[in-house]
Amino acid sequence: MKRTLKVSFFILCLLPLFLGSKAEQCGSQAGGAVCPNGLCCSKFGFCGSTDPYCGDGCQSQCKSSPTPTIPTPSTGGGDVGRLVPSSLFDQMLKYRNDGRCAGHGFYTYDAFIAAARSFNGFGTTGDDNTKKKELAAFLAQTSHETTGGWPTAPDGPYAWGYCFVSEQNTQEVYCSPKDWPCAPGKKYYGRGPIQLTHNYNYGLAGQAIKEDLINNPDLLSTNPTVSFKTAIWFWMTPQANKPSSHDVITGRWTPSAADSSAGRVPGYGVITNIINGGIECGHGQDNRVDDRVGFYKRYCQIFGVDPGGNLDCNNQRSFA
């Protein structure tokens, strides 16, 4: 059993935003360009929605202008438990507590429900079919990130989601201290359902859920509610020129002209592009994409909803 992908691959696509290894995106450094999706333009010419971008020196679309709202925990999300009772959760993630899974016993139903109810709109947007599709999509993408399945696994490879808590290579530090610090001796490798990676993602997620994840990154592998919260935060939050996965699956995202020309059309495939498009998308068939689709189809079948079209990103250019 081996987890096939980790979010660190996706983060490679975001490194230009944080490390400055790519040409500036906006402002005087980019010929007066304005950031997409209402993002702030920092004094250094990069797009974002947090204080380093919208605060001192911000060049355009600053705090007085509309910017994307980064979700913070609230008391919303009333009926996720109605749509996903514990019996259904156990059916979907059938082997998560199997002794052959390194993370057995960690991902509890109660932790998922508590985290889900902390974010307004998650699993509660639209009609019941839309809500179920979002929950199926979230559980499918995170199941792929934590999969312990193999082709001949009991009940098939798509019954083995949520098998791992931490990535298998725990030697990498993943510290890029330009915008967020790194605590001495701490590592920011992939942890949790979305395999959150890099200190700046730990910092942003911790800021949103009010936990000090810079100094306590291991909370993602010791506290299942915190772990689920970081995954849902990632799901609900737009990234630079990328929409949130939540907006895509609930039909709230409208592709721009650039998206359309890149083949990025509404559907589950765009979510894979958001998460790991620089690695998996745009070069034809990819086994990792197929695995994500396989989980999604299984979960949609369990929910009794149509998965819809545009499930892969084989012919989509990445957002990067």
Curated annotation (Swiss-Prot):
Protein name (database record): Endochitinase
Enzymatic class: hydrolase
Any Pfam family: Glyco_hydro_19
Disulfide bonds: 26-41, 35-47, 40-54, 58-62, 101-163, 175-182, 281-313
Entry keywords, A to Z: Carbohydrate metabolism, Chitin degradation, Chitin-binding, Disulfide bond, Glycosidase, Hydrolase, Plant defense, Polysaccharide degradation, Signal
Secretion signal span: 1-23
Active-site residues, as the UniProt record annotates them: 145 (proton donor)
Enzyme Commission number, as recorded: 3.2.1.14
Organism from which the protein derives: Pisum sativum
Induction of the gene: By fungal infection.
Catalytic activities: Random endo-hydrolysis of N-acetyl-beta-D-glucosaminide (1->4)-beta-linkages in chitin and chitodextrins
Keyword Thylakoid assigned: no
Listed transmembrane segments: none
Any one GO BP annotation for this protein: polysaccharide catabolic process
GO function terms (MF aspect): chitin binding; endochitinase activity
Biological role stated in the UniProt entry: Defense against chitin-containing fungal pathogens.
Similarity comment text for this entry: Belongs to the glycosyl hydrolase 19 family. Chitinase class I subfamily.
Keyword Chaperone: no
Domain Chitin-binding type-1: 24-64
